[in-house]
Amino acid sequence: MMAQYLRIKAEFPDTLVFYRMGDFYELFYEDARKAHRLLDITITTRGQSAGEPVVMAGVPVHSVETYLARLIKLGEAVAVAEQVGDVTTSKGPVERKVVRVVTPGTLTDSELLADRSESLLLALVSQIAPTGSRSASGPQALRWGLAWLGMASGRLGVAECEGADLGSWLARLEPAELLLPPPDEHTRGATAFNTIWANAGRATAVLTHRPAWQFDAALGRRKLCEQLKVQSLQAFGAEDLGVAHAAAAALLSYAQQTQSQALSHVQSLEAPSGQDLIDLPPSTVRNLELTRTLRGEDSPTLLSLMDSCRTGMGSRLLRQWLTHPLRDRHQARLRHQAIGSLLAWPAGLPPKATPESPANPAASPAFEALRQALRHTCDVERISTRVALRQVRPRELAGLRETLQALPALRATVLGAAEHAQLLAQDAQALQPDAQILETLGALAHEPAALLRDGGVVAPGVDAELDELRAIAQNCDAFLLDLEARERERTGIGNLRVQFNKVHGFYIEVTSSGLDRVPADYQRRQTLKNAERFITPELKAFEDKALSAQDRSLAREKWLFEQMVEALATHLSALQRLAQALARLDVLACLAERAQTLQWTEPQFVNHPCIDIEAGRHPVVQARLQETRGAAFMPNHCRLDARTKMLVITGPNMGGKSTFMRQVALIVLLASMGSYVPAQSCRLGPIDAIHTRIGAADDLANAQSTFMVEMTEAAAILHRASEHSLVLMDEIGRGTSTEDGLALAGAIATHLHERNRCFTLFATHYFELTAFAQHHPQALNVHVGAVESGQDIVFLHEIAPGPASRSYGVQVARLAGMPAAVVRQARNTLGSLERRALAQQPQVDLFAGVAAPAAAAAEPNSTARAVIELLEGLQPDTLSPREALEALYRLKDAANGSSA
């Protein structure tokens, strides 16, 4: 047996192996020690192998999912080896085989998965971009290939990007597990990835290294074509994504290995381009608290506020819409249209009518009826996957049957509103139950057992042989009562009993007082202290028949259930289309409910550059104020267009500058994803990215101070923001001297205004920056209001024109509970500093043009040009130490006038 275990373990050296032995899964040697540490289970030794004690630990079969869930949460992978041989016919150890490998990115079991989020598996690989390609910003630029798979949903995707965009992809995909080539074989890619990964802040994902040969582009293209049953990937827009094909090769190999079978539920491919999506860098996802708070919690976030979906698949789709907003506004317009129709259309109003047609005055909006109907639907998406993988449970199929039976009523609810909304009309077509699927599921018992091994899964009347075997088992009690009565009469033993237990089977029990009357045909089976147990030829014959019938009944039922699943697997495409329609309807109904409950309005898209928000609100802050019965939220306007590209925002801490900036970004994001928005009105022009530099945080793990993190993020924004980007800059320049910070803040504001020409909200405590608007016509000063009352301060949280008169830092310190002596000294010192500032010379003009040295006007000579060309071709973020040294030598040669 240990030889068999060691053979299996050799195939999975870095994975915990759960080795099935009867009613337990056993772990041996180092696996047992590790499981003991992680799960706090008992460790023991038994016998010897190769002269060493066999260290072992085990978990019960009936509770294995609980232990698997704990291990997955800790980032472990587990290979489950089941007994596949027949115990009764095996000579020697029963044959065992690994039937699945459970890893964080390949989960399919409902007990291991979170209902409302997806566990994505992502493969990454890089290569040097070809010279002259659009992706190569230098001769040594890296091009990244991505391939991802949602094992539980069948969602498969590929993409390519430059290193600067990789962080955004990691933030939007949020993988649970990452597949990478060995770092020692891809040094440059590994170095670049480590930097990007640290900045993305996604250290919770498990990193799994796969052999370098698995990242092969030709192999990946062939695997993708085989998986999708096509000759070319042209129809998916993925034919020319060679680096992504290499990632897909490793992804599909790993996925098929973990499932020990083909992935028949993976039937489509998405190949989004970074140019199709609004860019949301990791800092934006983090600072806007889209899916997690800054503390890493799931609530309160924008997603937690918005997610009132009735199904898990709806919640997962909502998360995807939120993190994948599209630049093309057509899809968002269709979603707005559907939400408006669900809000306006009364439930029960027939198609071809108008919303103003007479209806039941008590009728609720269509979205409420739709949400009520969705309560009776199950997670069709994940159930269809488990059907494809032959892992589905009886009660999941019962839920699928209930969903199909609810479709006619659900479709009738949608049809009326669908007349005026294209998305609703498309989904209504998918809400027609397939008669063959319903017929197949009709063989299922009305309330099947939770597990197939318990029996009672197939309905009576479906199979004559099964009914006959069940009848034998069901008539068992009647037979035993009849036999007991006959034997009492025949023997005259009044307390004789006929019983059954799992150890000894059927038996006749006679107490000591009646043993002298036991007939000769009674055969002794067991002796007890005060009784004897016997069996007769008649009882033995019945036992053989009954026990055989029970085993044969379970075997027959298992076979019938497997046939049912095989039949359902032929309708996988229809089930997946149904799942997509139900998920989309759930999200649209959720967004309609949120729009009505939170009093959100439909945004309007325009073609010219514009962010025009009337009475905008921060949705999460407003909701928290209402929950805590705090002060009413103060709405604020924001108007940015071709004439006003930048708002310079000043005012006190706690005044609401950051809240105002974040609410503008959230409103832009919500409108772009297809939701209504928390504002009285909203007009929005084209947007290609939302960049943020908000808050302060050290990155100790990567030896970066708060100021370094701030400058790194600001530099990325200056390099990437376009005239269609929205940029939030909050108090840039902190963490260094006032002079340095002020100079940097002024230079950054100038670059954003003159070079990037993006929409910018620039919050600052440097009062000197309020002069920026005097020198730059597209900049405007605004401030958050505050009123002093004696030594107290009242924050108005209102954005008003013009600069703030002061920052009120001392008053805020007093509100924070600072000792009175400290506040008093600070106030006196502040007065002295202000008087001294008034007596000094006028401050240097921060925004005057930089005077160029006289020599700079001259045309650079050939040596200077050679050095400049070499510098322009370098990519410092991707250079290895060796390559950096070689580049330095080339620069020195060029500076000395020799050939580079």
PLM regions: where:
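Charged, surface-exposed helical/loop "interaction arms" that form contiguous linear patches used
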Residues: 389, 393, 403-406, 460-461, ...
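C-terminal tails and terminal domains of large nucleic-acid-associated
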Residues: 864-900
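Cytosolic, long alpha-helical scaffolding segments
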Residues: 434-444, 506-522
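Active-site phosphate-binding and catalytic loops of NTP-dependent enzymes
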Residues: 81, 104-113, 262, 481-493, ...
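Charged catalytic and DNA/RNA-contacting regions of genome-maintenance
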Residues: 1-343, 347-351, 356-361, 375-388, ...
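ATPase nucleotide-binding head domains, primarily ABC-like/P-loop NTPase cores
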Residues: 29-32, 241, 310, 321, ...
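Extended, charged coiled-coil "arm/hinge" scaffolds of SMC/Rad50-like chromosome-maintenance ATPases
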Residues: 528, 532-566
